[in-house]
């Protein structure tokens, strides 16, 4: 099982598009809200990263799920991949219901103590009230993505990502500007986009995946679930901790003023692109390594990792140069506010 650069890229690109989907939803919200006002742009930073921190709990669990599925796939125990997949679906479905309730009930109490501006606080709560519904679709989506990446069949992820963006952009424009729903409209559009992406993968799994080969029948296996949790709890913790400091950073910036918060949001949105590249290659590496270990081909691990590293630099390097060279264009794309545009050196930093 000697993976070539082309094979690695063909597996990774849909994964990258899939991870980029979640970030592009936040970026699109920021771009549209940047043309509404500083309060909305700043509030989208706080609410977006707050939502993302919760989302990363599911994302972290999906990493462990993907590793287990990939291992079974490499061992050619294909029916076990389906059994493992359903344990992941059960856990993610239960967790997302609890998290949605907590978001609605606890968020106002937590954020009221952290956010000083009443305007920004109200805008953040309005956003989260609608955005939290997106978790009901994004968590099952994560389970589907883990399965497809684990069996190295990832083309459908690109279609799902395109569907999400095709829904998010027009609905953002319609709900924010035409129906004057402001930041609530952005949250509605984002949740609809995640629903669309989920439906794409659901239909693909139902129609195209060999359900007999992969044992895709509803079954509960407590032992598999416990083993899955032992693997996933650490990736859940790591994923949450990797994002939570960003929220604390934005809370600190909010105390400086709405303009500073808006500028920081633009900076984070640009840097998110590089986060996506790193995350996608990490996800692909985890799947390929698990498949190789399952197939008993440990000698291929380091050559594959070296190839992934080279591809990562080849993709990320030019984008860094473009971000540094075209920062003035980036600012103008987000906002037409002269006050924000004069602070362009933050982007250079």
What is the predicted function of each stretch?
Residues 41-104, 138-157, 263-327:
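Small-residue-rich hydrophobic transmembrane alpha-helices
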């Amino acid at each position: 099982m000697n993976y070539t650069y082309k094979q690695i890229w063909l597996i990774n690109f849909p994964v990258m598009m899939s991870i980029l989907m979640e970030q592009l939803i936040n970026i699109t919200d920021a771009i549209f809200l940047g043309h509404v006002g500083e309060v909305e742009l700043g509030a989208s930073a706080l609410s977006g990263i707050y939502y993302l921190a919760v989302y990363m709990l599911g994302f972290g669990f999906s990493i462990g799920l993907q590793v287990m599925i990939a291992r079974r796939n490499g061992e050619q125990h294909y029916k076990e991949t389906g059994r493992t997949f359903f344990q992941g679906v059960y856990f993610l479905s239960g967790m997302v219901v609890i998290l949605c309730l907590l978001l609605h009930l606890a968020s106002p109490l937590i954020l009221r103590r952290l956010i000083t501006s009443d305007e920004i606080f109200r805008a953040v709560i309005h956003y989260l009230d609608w955005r939290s519904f997106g978790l009901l679709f994004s968590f099952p989506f994560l389970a589907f993505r883990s399965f497809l990446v684990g069996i190295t069949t990832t083309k459908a992820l690109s279609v799902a990502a395109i569907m999400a963006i095709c829904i998010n952009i027009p609905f953002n424009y319609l709900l924010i500007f035409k129906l004057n729903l402001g930041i609530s409209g952005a949250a509605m559009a984002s949740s609809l986009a995640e629903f669309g992406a989920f439906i794409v993968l659901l239909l693909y799994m139902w129609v195209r995946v060999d359900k007999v080969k992969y044992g895709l029948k509803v079954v509960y296996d407590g032992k598999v679930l416990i083993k899955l949790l032992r693997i996933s709890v650490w990736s859940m913790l790591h994923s949450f901790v990797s994002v939570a400091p960003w929220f604390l950073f934005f809370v600190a910036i909010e105390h400086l003023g709405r303009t500073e918060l808006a500028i920081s949001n633009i900076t984070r949105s640009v840097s998110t692109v590089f986060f996506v590249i790193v995350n996608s290659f990490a996800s692909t590496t985890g799947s390929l390594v698990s498949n190789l270990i399952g197939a008993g081909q440990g000698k291929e691990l380091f050559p594959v990792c070296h190839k992934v590293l080279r591809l990562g630099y080849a993709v990320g390097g030019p984008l860094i140069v473009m971000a540094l060279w075209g920062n003035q264009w980036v600012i103008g794309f987000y906002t037409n506010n002269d006050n924000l545009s004069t602070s362009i050196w933050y982007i250079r930093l």
